[in-house]
Curated annotation (Swiss-Prot):
Gene3D superfamilies reported in the protein's UniProt record: Peroxisome assembly protein 22 (3.40.50.11730)
Protein's UniProt name: Peroxisome assembly protein 22
A GO CC annotation given for this chain: peroxisomal membrane
Subcellular localization: Peroxisome membrane
Family in the record: Belongs to the peroxin-22 family.
Length: 156
């Protein structure tokens, strides 16, 4: 009987040792995974600092909300719209938008004429251009949440 007890003790110790080794291997895999993920993330951050953001390299995109004031102040619409920009024409100055479309036929696709003002603001939200260029007298009509969709608002 004594032999059976010793065998049972030995068997229990052996099973406990295997369970301990299994736990240690699971912990080791977890630690190694955490270290690998951390190193990968740090490399990602380091490479991001070395390579400038694409948004910093390319010219800033612009969205113009056309009013009579804005039309009068900018002299060369050909140059302004040839960059990464678009012009949204308010209903009250649709005639100016049509005039510009005739003058600038090569970039007329960048001039969008709207029938109502709320559609203009919706388009500004969806375009998500970096800069919104707008006349000072139209800022009161501008929705409050618009600042979330553009990087900067310039008043002319």
């Amino acid at each position: 009987m004594r032999g059976d007890k010793e065998t049972t003790n030995w068997l229990n110790k052996s099973l406990m040792k295997q369970a301990r080794q299994k736990k240690l291997s699971i912990i080791a895999v977890g630690v190694l995974s955490t270290v690998a993920v951390t190193v990968g993330y740090l490399l990602y951050l380091y490479r991001g600092q070395r390579n400038p953001n694409i948004r910093d390299v390319k010219p800033k995109s612009k969205c113009y909300v056309l009013t009579q004031d804005l039309f009068d102040k900018i002299e060369n619409w050909q140059e302004e719209l040839s960059k990464d920009s678009v012009m949204l024409v308010l209903p009250e100055v649709a005639h100016l938008g049509n005039h510009l479309k005739l003058q600038l036929s090569s970039i007329e696709h960048k001039i969008v004429i709207f029938n109502n003002s709320s559609a203009v603001w919706s388009a500004v939200r969806h375009l998500k251009k970096y800069e919104l260029v707008i006349s000072r007298d139209k800022t009161s009509d501008m929705p409050v949440d618009l600042r979330r969709y553009v990087g900067q608002i310039s008043h002319i």
